[in-house]
From Swiss-Prot:
Lipidation positions, renumbered (N-myristoyl glycine): G2
Membrane topology per record: Lipid-anchor
Gene: HIR3
Coiled-coil zones: 113-139, 165-185
Protein name, entry field: Hypersensitive-induced response protein 3
């Protein structure tokens, strides 16, 4: 701003305050303004109408006794029609704004637990903005926006919170892993059950085919060889199967088969036991 031939230049987005012998005269708008110094007029100071930002750090304690540092960002500007109030009524507007911010934050945060402070930071910012706007408008300042840009707990508390979050994530991961293993085991059991069912069907069909073949063999042999009975044919078939079994067991060195008495007479004894068991079952039914 210059002062030449009783004229001053007020820059764009600024206003100047003119006084005469120490008394307020008027607010000078941007442009070339006439200030006759010969009659005691002079420019007492200037104010910017630009948007200004003030970051305020406030340390306080939550309801659950955790110390936190809350950082609030205040965006404000001077009201052009109240520039004289902004110039004369406040000697240090930033100090006044900080005082209101401290007052509101320290009134709101102690009512909330730490987790609630993070969740309700927008409500805290709104409370600060409403209180500031109500107070600062009378002094010629407009509060445009208030933001809570950071909430910083004590370092030990922050470390504990990180450990709690890590433990919670590990619990979730362990639960998901256990659920996956459970599904795998269920599917494996279902597969084994289906496999055993199909294997049982195959064994049943195999045994049915064996029974049908034996029946046909017994009937055919008894019909073609006079003097033989069905019992004689069954004894001969069982003896043949016995020797086949002995051959299969001896073919491997790691057989886990249960070995029953192997004398030739034992086959007849086993056959007799089977027949007696069948007869007893038929009589009982």
């Amino acid at each position: 701003m210059g002062n030449l031939f009783c004229c001053v230049l007020v820059k764009q987005s600024d206003v100047a305050v003119k006084e005469r012998f120490g008394k307020f005269q008027k607010v000078l708008n941007p442009g070339l303004q006439f200030v006759p110094w010969v009659i005691g007029d002079y420019v007492a100071g200037t104010l910017t109408l630009r948007l200004q930002q003030l970051d305020v750090q406030c340390e306080t304690k939550t309801k659950d006794n955790v110390f936190v540092t809350v950082v609030a960002s205040i965006q404000y500007r001077v009201l052009a029609d109240k520039a004289s109030d902004a110039f004369y009524r406040l000697s240090n507007p930033t100090t006044q704004i900080k005082a209101y911010v401290f007052d509101v934050i320290r009134a709101c945060v102690p009512k909330l637990n730490l987790d609630d402070v993070f969740e309700q930071k927008n409500e805290i910012a709104k409370s600060v903005e409403e209180e500031l706007d109500k107070a600062m408008t009378a002094y010629g300042y407009e509060i445009l926006q208030t933001l809570i840009i950071d909430i910083e707990p004590d370092q030990q508390v922050k470390r504990a919170m990180n450990e709690i979050n890590a433990a919670a994530r590990m619990r979730v991961a362990a639960s998901e892993k256990a659920e996956a293993e459970k599904i795998i085991q269920i599917k494996r059991a279902e597969g084994e059950a289906e496999s055993k069912y199909l294997s049982g069907l195959g064994i049943a069909r195999q045994r049915q085919a064996i029974v049908d073949g034996l029946r046909d063999s017994v009937l055919g042999f008894a019909g073609n060889v006079p003097g033989t009975s069905a019992k004689d044919v069954l004894d001969m078939v069982m003896m043949t199967q016995y020797f086949d079994t002995m051959r299969d067991i001896g073919a491997t060195s790691k057989s886990s088969a249960v070995f029953i008495p192997h004398g030739p007479g034992a086959v007849s004894d086993v056959a007799a036991q089977i027949r007696n068991g069948l007869l007893q079952a038929n009589n009982a039914s």
